[in-house]
Regions:
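Conserved MFS/SLC helix-loop-helix module at the cytosolic interface between two early adjacent transmembrane helices
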Residues: 50-89
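Extracytoplasmic
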Residues: 1-34, 50, 225-230, 351-355
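Extracytoplasmic gate region of multi-pass secondary transporters
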Residues: 19-21, 205-262, 321, 348-356
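Helix-breaking motifs and short loop linkers at transmembrane-helix boundaries and internal kinks
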Residues: 31, 63, 84-90, 118, ...
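Paired small-residue
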Residues: 74, 78, 89-97, 301-309
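Helix-loop-helix hairpin linking two adjacent transmembrane segments in secondary transporters
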Residues: 129-179
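Cytoplasmic helix-loop-helix junction between adjacent transmembrane helices
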Residues: 94-133
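Juxtamembrane intracellular "pre-TM" segments in multi-pass secondary transporters
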Residues: 178-212, 414-430
Length: 430
């Protein structure tokens, strides 16, 4: 039952990274600037971020099967719209709609899996589902570039759209929300008022914001790197799109191991959250500085090694969710995870357009077949901003609360109550 929703999530992740592969094609087809390409990419993240909370309500209210099938149909329609777009408005609308449909895929796959697998296997299920997403991001690099080379970028979107519609149909016909006779089928859906109240409590908790902001800036760097690494390798190293996409897959390949390994080490070995998050973010900053310092001079093997190292250190992101969950009431764990997860998508959405403008500001007027060719100085400026994002993420991690893998909300609440209690008259508070 979980396989079809997971396959839909796989395609959603392909769409997340696809603009990096087709950036030059979009420039050629529409005369687009770097800022336009960045804004196009961000449309996915804007819709994903804006619809993340309602997506959870829909899944709980209408069932995962129907919601995933509808989301996949919407995502497929958006992909088809991008494939036939003759102007930027339809291209942007299609990208936005793709993100809208993709919003339900991860939550829905977990919901289906949780109903069909024992509770003791949920952590493994979540890790495997996240790994499916990483595999999708890999498929969105070299394999997608190979498909574009054969079918063209429009053909690739049409193929993805049709495949997604087939999966939507299979989901509606074959997937079931619960095993027959399951008690979960009778569980009441959360009310809108209850969800809103929980959201207010989570947002009002000051300990929610450090993991939110750390993920915001970390994913701002990661998202922009995924968007511009293929154009960088094409413009500076004169690689083909297919060759550049092969190198661009390095971070995702590394995350296949680093994400699960980071979670395991945090849970079972060091039994810390803040410490590994801070250390790995510091390592990421060092790698970013090395990457920026060697732009255009490092052999391609060295570029691949640095990108792979970025992916290894980037495994820190998996700690964002437990850090958000463990400082909030256990009954609000779902909302807490959704809120801190929102930080990463907003980080990508709000920065990709402006970073494209940074490239445009340093463009020297050179174009090839209608696509802008940016000089090394432009990429140096853009990737330096990404390094700056990582620095801010590191500083934010210093404000994280160490949970040691346990929910500490009650401890934090008692601490607030103790500080707000007036000291005894004539004495001192301790």
């Amino acid at each position: 039952m979980w396989g079809i929703p997971a396959a839909i999530f796989f395609i959603a992740f392909i769409h997340r990274v696809v603009p990096g592969v087709i950036a030059k094609d979009v420039m050629q087809a529409f005369g687009a600037t770097g800022a336009i390409v960045g804004l196009l990419s961000s449309m996915y993240f804007y819709s994903y971020a804006g619809f993340m909370i309602p997506a959870g309500l829909l899944i709980d209210g209408f069932g995962a099967r129907s919601t995933i099938a509808a989301g996949a149909a919407v995502m497929g329609a958006g992909s088809l719209a991008m494939g036939v777009a003759t102007g930027e408005p339809l291209l942007f609308a299609g990208r936005f709609v793709v993100g809208l449909g993709a919003t339900v895929t991860f939550i829905g796959a977990l919901k289906i899996g949780a109903a069909w697998f024992p509770p003791s296997q949920f952590a493994t299920l979540a890790a495997v589902t996240a790994t499916v997403g990483v595999l999708g991001s890999i498929a969105g690099t070299y394999p997608l570039a190979a498909l574009v080379a054969v079918a063209g970028w429009r053909g690739a979107f049409l193929i993805l759209g049709l495949l997604t519609l087939v999966l939507a149909t299979l989901c509606g016909l074959l997937v079931r929300n619960h095993p027959a006779g399951s008690a979960a089928a009778d569980a009441p859906a959360p009310s809108l008022a209850g969800m809103a109240g929980g959201m207010i409590l989570v947002l009002g908790n000051r300990h929610t914001w450090p993991p939110f902001l750390a993920f915001f800036f970390a994913y701002a760097a990661m998202g922009n790197q995924m968007l511009w690494i293929v154009p960088y390798l094409r413009d500076v190293y004169e690689l083909s799109t297919t060759q550049a996409a092969l190198y661009a897959s390095a971070p995702s390949l590394a995350m296949l191991a680093s994400g699960p390994l980071t979670g395991y080490l945090s849970d079972r070995v060091v039994r810390r959250r803040k410490l590994p998050y801070t250390v790995l973010t510091a390592v990421s900053l060092v790698i970013w500085i090395a990457f920026v310092a060697t732009l255009g001079t490092l052999p391609l093997g060295g570029v691949f090694a640095l990108l792979f190292a970025m992916g290894l250190a980037g495994g820190a992101f998996v700690l964002t969710w437990p850090l958000g969950r463990e400082v909030n009431p256990p009954s609000l764990s779902g909302i807490a995870v959704a809120v801190v997860n929102l930080g990463g998508f907003l980080g990508a959405a709000l920065t990709q357009g402006p970073l494209g403008a940074v490239l445009d500001a340093r463009w020297t007027g050179v174009s090839v077949a209608g696509a802008r060719v940016y000089p090394l100085a432009a990429y140096h400026a853009a990737f330096s901003v990404c390094a700056g994002f990582t620095l801010v993420a590191l500083l934010v991690t210093l404000g994280l609360r160490e949970t040691r893998g346990e929910n500490i909300h009650h401890q934090l609440a008692r601490g607030v109550a103790a500080r707000s209690r007036p000291a005894p008259r004539g004495g001192y508070s301790t």
